[in-house]
């Protein structure tokens, strides 16, 4: 038998912003597909029309575009297995619901929500299963004629899966090994509702995966309890031979490790849990995103890849190509992964250092414009090269290097008190004269002449340099002094020195 082609899918519901845990699931599917020369399918699971949120689907697609996770087929991408939106597959699902009814694997139930609530009040831990279905209003207990009459009269119903009692169900998981669950703990899940003529998640999921020839289902651990039901559905349809392999990924946990990561954790600790900023159309609430917070997509990808997986060595920084080469589902953890958001910041810092000065400068130009600064691009590149090792986010560059673009209008009081001596005004006036006479205003050209002048005058080097820095920067920060004066140029350097002497003398 020929080896089966790898086909995996990511199938979100358009119910709001995409959680960062969903991004990791999509990433692992993408890495697995690329490593095996397979296909990644983008499917929209919109069977629950009540939870539909306008703009959510577009948001999800934009998130993956930013992150560089590319789909091969699906909604917005086309393909031979469509339609890829579940709400457009109603007739397909109806056909397979009928297959289960015809072979006795499912039945029709007419119980109203009120009747079910009454049962729950009457019986502790009530579930609709082999022990209780005999006392309910369904096609197993009602005469065939009555069932047909109720349907003809427009009586609303659901189709339930008929779970056989006390049967061991084996789920082979690529991460967790064999998981065995007894069917007695499962209820007769609703597979279809006549009210909206749509299936529930479970039926649509199985039918779509089968018809789209999905080879591996890689999804979050929260779906592990549903896996036995899915195995039974494959068996009921006679699809066991082509049932996909399962891999249930570890949960993303709170930074403290106690419980599942939520948006509240991000709000509490100040980090995003969504890839992009999200404007909730219902509540009006705006939630922060990794892109708008200044994270580089490569850093987010690298950070997420290591939440629940490791390459088997100490390597941490990996490009997408390296991740594709190294990724192995068998190296995924069974236990949850703490969401160490500080590690995400470290990755962003690392990737900023790895990018060229020109690339970071291109990202910094919009920040400068926000502050009303228009500067020659060559100057921006030079400044970035000097200062990027001091920041973890591009927007932080403004905090550490704004003085390169805007002259100080005031001078830090603590620095003035500590660094501006009685003779500083006189010394800076003399230094300005020395600098004015320098023809070669390069870093080396300035340094040699100024240091010779200091030695000749017998001045204290630290006092001169501290005062010089204060005149150009306005405080005691910044790189090497002659780097600053070289970038500013002779004219701007002398103008700043003159103004500082006038203000501070």
Swiss-Prot record:
GO terms for cellular component: cytosol. It comes from the Bacteria. SUPFAM superfamilies: An anticodon-binding domain of class I aminoacyl-tRNA synthetases, Nucleotidylyl transferase. Keywords: Aminoacyl-tRNA synthetase, ATP-binding, Cytoplasm, Ligase, Nucleotide-binding, Protein biosynthesis. The keyword Protein biosynthesis applies. A motif ('HIGH' region) lies at residues 12-22. It catalyses: tRNA(Glu) + L-glutamate + ATP = L-glutamyl-tRNA(Glu) + AMP + diphosphate. Its EC number is 6.1.1.17. Catalyzes the attachment of glutamate to tRNA(Glu) in a two-step reaction: glutamate is first activated by ATP to form Glu-AMP and then transferred to the acceptor end of tRNA(Glu). Belongs to the class-I aminoacyl-tRNA synthetase family. Glutamate--tRNA ligase type 1 subfamily. PANTHER family: GLUTAMATE--TRNA LIGASE, GLUTAMATE--TRNA LIGASE, MITOCHONDRIAL-RELATED. Monomer. This is Glutamate--tRNA ligase. It comes from Bacteroides fragilis (strain ATCC 25285 / DSM 2151 / CCUG 4856 / JCM 11019 / LMG 10263 / NCTC 9343 / Onslow / VPI 2553 / EN-2).
């Amino acid at each position: 038998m020929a080896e089966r082609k790898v086909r995996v899918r990511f199938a979100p519901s358009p119910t709001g912003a995409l959680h960062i845990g969903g991004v990791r699931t999509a990433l692992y599917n993408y890495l697995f597909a690329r490593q095996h020369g397979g296909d990644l399918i983008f499917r929209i699971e919109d069977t629950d029309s009540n939870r539909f949120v306008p703009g959510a689907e577009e948001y999800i697609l934009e998130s993956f575009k930013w992150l560089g996770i590319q789909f091969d087929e699906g909604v917005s991408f086309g393909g031979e297995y469509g339609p890829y939106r579940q709400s457009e597959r109603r007739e397909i699902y109806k056909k397979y619901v009928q297959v289960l009814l015809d072979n006795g694997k499912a039945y029709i139930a007419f119980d109203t929500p009120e009747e079910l609530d009454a049962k729950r009040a009457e019986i502790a831990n009530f579930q609709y299963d082999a022990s209780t279905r005999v006392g309910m209003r369904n096609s197993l207990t009602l005469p065939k004629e009555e069932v047909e009459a109720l349907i003809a009269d427009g009586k609303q119903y659901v189709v339930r899966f008929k779970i056989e009692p006390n049967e061991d169900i084996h789920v082979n998981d690529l991460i967790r090994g064999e998981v065995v669950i007894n069917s007695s703990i499962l209820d007769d899940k609703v597979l279809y509702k006549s009210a909206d003529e749509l299936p529930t998640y479970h039926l649509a999921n199985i039918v779509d995966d089968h018809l789209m020839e999905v080879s591996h289902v890689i999804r979050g651990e929260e779906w592990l309890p549903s896996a036995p039901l899915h195995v039974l559905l494959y068996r009921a349809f006679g699809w066991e031979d082509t049932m996909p392999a399962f891999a249930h990924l570890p949960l993303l946990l709170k930074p403290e490790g106690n419980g599942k990561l939520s948006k509240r954790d991000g709000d509490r600790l100040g980090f995003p849990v969504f890839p992009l900023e999200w404007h909730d159309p219902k509540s009006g609430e705006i939630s922060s995103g990794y892109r708008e917070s200044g994270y580089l997509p490569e850093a987010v990808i690298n950070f997420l890849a290591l939440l629940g997986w490791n390459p088997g060595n100490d390597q941490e920084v990996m490009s997408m190509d390296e991740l594709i080469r190294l990724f192995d589902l068998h190296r995924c953890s069974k236990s949850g992964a703490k969401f160490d958001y500080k590690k995400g910041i470290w990755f962003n810092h690392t990737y900023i250092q790895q990018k060229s000065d020109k690339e970071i400068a291109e990202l910094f130009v919009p920040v400068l414009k926000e502050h009303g600064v228009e500067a020659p691009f060559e100057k921006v590149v030079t400044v970035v090269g000097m200062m990027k090792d001091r920041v973890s986010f591009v927007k932080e560059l403004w905090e550490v290097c704004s003085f390169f673009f805007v002259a100080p209008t005031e001078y830090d009081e603590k620095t003035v008190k500590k660094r501006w001596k009685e003779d500083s005004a006189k010394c800076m006036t003399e230094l300005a004269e020395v600098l004015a006479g320098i023809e070669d205003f390069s870093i080396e050209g300035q340094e040699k002449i100024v240091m010779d002048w200091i030695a000749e005058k017998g001045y204290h080097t630290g006092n001169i340099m501290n005062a010089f820095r204060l005149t150009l920067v306005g405080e005691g920060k910044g790189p090497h002094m002659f780097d600053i004066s070289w970038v500013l140029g002779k004219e701007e350097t002398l103008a700043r020195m003159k103004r500082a002497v006038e203000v501070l003398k």
